[in-house]
């Protein structure tokens, strides 16, 4: 009789624990503004981020040589490698090939460069996403993530924030750069530089056929050097674009 009671008691505890686990998994998502407030605090706070006016990032691309990225507040960016230079002056983008041929950058093609040169852009996420909605928690590599969804006309961008560190871990973009394919950016290996926390590894992947992955390993980051605005402007054909500090 006692054994029967014990078995029934154990059974009830098993059901109760299962219900608790289900309730935890089914917990409502955290509010968007709470997730964002935790993120801003984790990277150093508004004051620390907003005092930065420019950035030079030197990185090695895995199996792809060295690249130098420049960012000038609010959204001018320049990427310089041995064979190519790509810039965005805040209005239009361009690419200068090794043969000094200048081409117009396709719509939205500047976004991946902005994400590399200024990963802290998401501190002011409301500047470029008109609508932000909470989503059920996700998981990356066994770690729980808070998720925010920014819908667009074709699909949505999903942003994953580590539930423990509150740092931005991943951005899955669909419908902005491409109507058909998903582009993913993973931010890894955060370190403190000048009072803010920045990723020192940025991994790009895409579902686009033939699209190349890119693994950016950052070597140095320098803030608040003087950068001339014309270095981000579209050059004339044959003109050499000079980058670096002024």
Predicted regions and their residues:
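Bacterial N-terminal signal peptides
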Residues: 10-21
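Short, conserved active-site entrance elements at the starts or edges of catalytic domains
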Residues: 112-147, 167-170
